[in-house]
Curated annotation (Swiss-Prot):
Name this polypeptide is given: Neuroendocrine convertase 1
Annotated keywords: Calcium, Cleavage on pair of basic residues, Cytoplasmic vesicle, Disease variant, Disulfide bond, Glycoprotein, Hydrolase, Obesity, Protease, Serine protease, Signal, Zymogen
Cellular component GO terms held in the UniProt record: extracellular space; membrane; neuron projection; secretory granule lumen; transport vesicle
P/Homo B domain sequence ranges: 460-597
Chain positions carrying an annotated carbohydrate: N173, N401, T632
Propeptide, residue positions: 28-110
Renumbered residue ranges of the record's region Disordered: 596-662
Biased composition (Polar residues): 630-642
Any Gene Ontology biological process: peptide biosynthetic process
EC id: 3.4.21.93
Record organism: Homo sapiens (Human)
Active site location: D167 (charge relay system), H208 (charge relay system), S382 (charge relay system)
Amino acid sequence: MERRAWSLQCTAFVLFCAWCALNSAKAKRQFVNEWAAEIPGGPEAASAIAEELGYDLLGQIGSLENHYLFKHKNHPRRSRRSAFHITKRLSDDDRVIWAEQQYEKERSKRSALRDSALNLFNDPMWNQQWYLQDTRMTAALPKLDLHVIPVWQKGITGKGVVITVLDDGLEWNHTDIYANYDPEASYDFNDNDHDPFPRYDPTNENKHGTRCAGEIAMQANNHKCGVGVAYNSKVGGIRMLDGIVTDAIEASSIGFNPGHVDIYSASWGPNDDGKTVEGPGRLAQKAFEYGVKQGRQGKGSIFVWASGNGGRQGDNCDCDGYTDSIYTISISSASQQGLSPWYAEKCSSTLATSYSSGDYTDQRITSADLHNDCTETHTGTSASAPLAAGIFALALEANPNLTWRDMQHLVVWTSEYDPLANNPGWKKNGAGLMVNSRFGFGLLNAKALVDLADPRTWRSVPEKKECVVKDNDFEPRALKANGEVIIEIPTRACEGQENAIKSLEHVQFEATIEYSRRGDLHVTLTSAAGTSTVLLAERERDTSPNGFKNWDFMSVHTWGENPIGTWTLRITDMSGRIQNEGRIVNWKLILHGTSSQPEHMKQPRVYTSYNTVQNDRRGVEKMVDPGEEQPTQENPKENTLVSKSPSSSSVGGRRDELEEGAPSQAMLRLLQSAFSKNSPPKQSPKKSPSAKLNIPYENFYEALEKLNKPSQLKDSEDSLYNDYVDVFYNTKPYKHRDDRLLQALVDILNEEN
């Protein structure tokens, strides 16, 4: 009896703690004097309800028909408590389908948490836009650009395409933006007027939207700043982040003028703090759905979303319902080194990647800035999404009839695996596509995308189908620490029905999971074709006891596969926290795709080299000093570095055995220049004093050996390029793997001289 009483007390205590946590989360909300309601009777019914119940009718919410926003005549502007009695009176009205009091939402701008084409344009910062042009000194260096120039050379520059940036405003009178500014694609939802001009303050906090817009549409050849990816497109700004953000404001922004705007670019989302789980509210979700169904005269709005900057916080973008949406194209970042940056998040919903900032030694992104200024320090996935939006604008100029799903297929089929190949995590799915949780299907390639979109050859993808798979007899399954729940899901993918699916696009696993510590859960889904995808990785900072309620975990990793067969879901907790417990309450698998294979997928994807030299660190070994005679078989240089064949080298480019020969002069100068905090030199490097090059090669390779030992890393999967493993912090304050290598070289130089 005593044991049972003690057990009941413990259970009561756990429930009390959960109740406190839930109410604590709610207590942080700030409710505003606005109510959203769905009223099928139209404006007349909405006006009548407002008059009868003491509201002012503020108007329709964005493009959502029969959805209206009300303001109560006798309620404070803000309150920590919801006005439940007012909401109930409104929702109980027979003319109202649904009603909700609006509350403030925390939204974070996704900038980083730290803060031969050279003569093509006369814009002063054009030669710093390394991601748009091939700025290599020699062919041995990695090719970095997004293949935009070949598209421009076809005369495709974004003409006739309208992009709007959902952010903190747009300095539309900026010299490098004004010629391309479109007031019909602009609005200020913070102040409810048609001018999205940002609010100035001493810290220039509201520069984000102007920078994002500049990346897309900076004017070319006007002697100002740089050049936008789609420099003849039209750009607008939606000011919605510089004030209270509610579901109604988000819906109005996402659904603004969808008959005129082609592409919406958003570089924000819920907090990237490693513990938030949040997605679009009811209204924003409906705005997404309306956009893809009605936007662009029925072809569908293109929504481009930055994948998030919570990498350092251990965040996972599968907990962000905006990037996790089937309606958005989620874009991640790659650094100038071709690596996953320190801020990037991993998730199964990321579709593709463009460039952005990396470590402090890497160059960043150039754009327009507040006060008619320019910047070369735009950072984070915030900078990646607008570059993608600009590339999509080029595709829409080439083929205005592309649907929103056509665009996603084009991205999947043309993104490049090769330039990012030396990062861990790549896998080939059952349709032969290379995919990675860090990068999606790879680096965007503007030329390949626009070429495939050619209206003379492109065939629009078949009609979208949706097949829901669930077990009506499923009983809740318990899960505890160090435990595992395995669910086998056999499916015929609605075979024989109108919604049968033979070629997959998105896959959603919708589940309600109750758990005492949400961040300890790990969810993996294996497709019928054998592709294993992490839908949720552990998040150390997420201590919430709230679990997941009808949450959609979305994956693109099985794109193109035939779904027929048995899928396997694994939900585990390997944290070792013995007090953890919970249960899987319900689930369903939602398959999105087509009943027939899209035309462009009837032949397998063929991956070709993105660059003539493999795009990794080993490229520098073949680099030749431009000022020196190149070695030939007849006249070999004594200092040429020769490595063993791949069969005698260890994994990850480590050299266990190397033939004698000192490192090349060019290699050392490249490494030394890269270690500088300044931007890399734009001219050919001058010859260094010969004394600086007299380095015992044994020491050099010893340094390489120590710095590349996988055994020092905690996670074997990430042993090659996990740049931020905590174990390294104990010895050196350098956060980037290359920094440690370069510092070792500098130490050798100092010792020898």
